[in-house]
Amino acid sequence: MTQTVTAAYGSIDKAINAYDELVSEGYPREKLFLDRQTSEVKVIVPEASQPEAEAILNRHGPDDLSARPYETP
């Protein structure tokens, strides 16, 4: 099952750094979303890749980290 992992950061700089690390680790940009107003990063990943994505996001000190099943628009 595909998951949407969301990390909320206290600053846009932390969010940008997390986003950039996901890109550098090979996550496709079309599966990433950076919300500059709320300083959130969302990544859509297969369940098997969820722990790795969460580890990357956690390295940047999020205020909150959550995951939920991905819902197609």
Regions found by a protein language model. Give the residues of each.
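Positively charged, small/polar-rich N-terminal and surface patches that mediate targeting and assembly
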Residues: 1-73
